[in-house]
């Protein structure tokens, strides 16, 4: 993957260590079978892996990841999460900042999170549990049905233990 050699050079990795550093990234992200392929021919998931490899090469103190597992199947997503978790735990030398639309991903990978509204206004900041305790007042479920029998719907609602009006 020429991309990784290029970014290793940009990040100042000495020439005598580049191959070793690139191989380490390739192995971390399970890209061994794709090392000789052009980036444009990789699947979407492998392109995500390559993007993360570019971000982590050279062990920078701050790693920025934009939706690192978006569009991945569940198995690939879990793999990516384990990679990100290992990076953030590695000698506590790198801080990982990521953006995501997935609360599940944020909870799996973050010790602190901020929630933005309209692309820029932070509404809350803290641990997942702090945010839930402070801002979560429940859930709203909206169901659209073609034909309604209000008695059956109320019975179903009661079976689920839900409160509120239909």
Question: Where are each of the predicted segments found?
Answer:
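Helix N-cap at the start of a conserved alpha-helix in ABC-type nucleotide-binding domains
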Residues: 74-76
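ABC transporter nucleotide-binding domain
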Residues: 82-166
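Conserved catalytic motifs of ABC-family nucleotide-binding domains
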Residues: 59
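Conserved ABC ATPase signature
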Residues: 38-42
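Catalytic Walker B motif of ABC-type/P-loop ATPase nucleotide-binding domains
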Residues: 63-66
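Conserved ABC ATPase "signature" region
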Residues: 5, 9-34, 86
């Amino acid at each position: 993957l020429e991309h990784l050699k290029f970014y290793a050079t940009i990040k100042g990795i000495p020439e005598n260590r580049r191959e070793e550093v690139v191989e380490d990234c390739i192995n971390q992200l399970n890209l061994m079978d794709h090392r000789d392929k052009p980036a444009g021919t990789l699947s979407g998931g492998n392109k995500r892996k390559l993007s993360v490899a570019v971000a982590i090469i050279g062990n920078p103190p701050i790693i920025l990841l934009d939706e690192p597992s978006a569009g991945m199947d569940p198995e690939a997503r879990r793999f990516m999460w384990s990679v990100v978790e290992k990076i953030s735990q590695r000698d506590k030398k790198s801080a990982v900042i990521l953006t995501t639309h997935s609360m599940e991903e944020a909870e799996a990978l973050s010790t602190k999170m901020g929630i933005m509204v309209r692309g820029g206004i932070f509404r809350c900041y803290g641990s997942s549990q702090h945010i839930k305790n402070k801002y979560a007042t429940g859930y709203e479920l909206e169901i659209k049905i073609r034909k309604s029998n209000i008695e059956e719907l109320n019975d179903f609602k009661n079976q689920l233990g839900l409160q509120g009006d239909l």
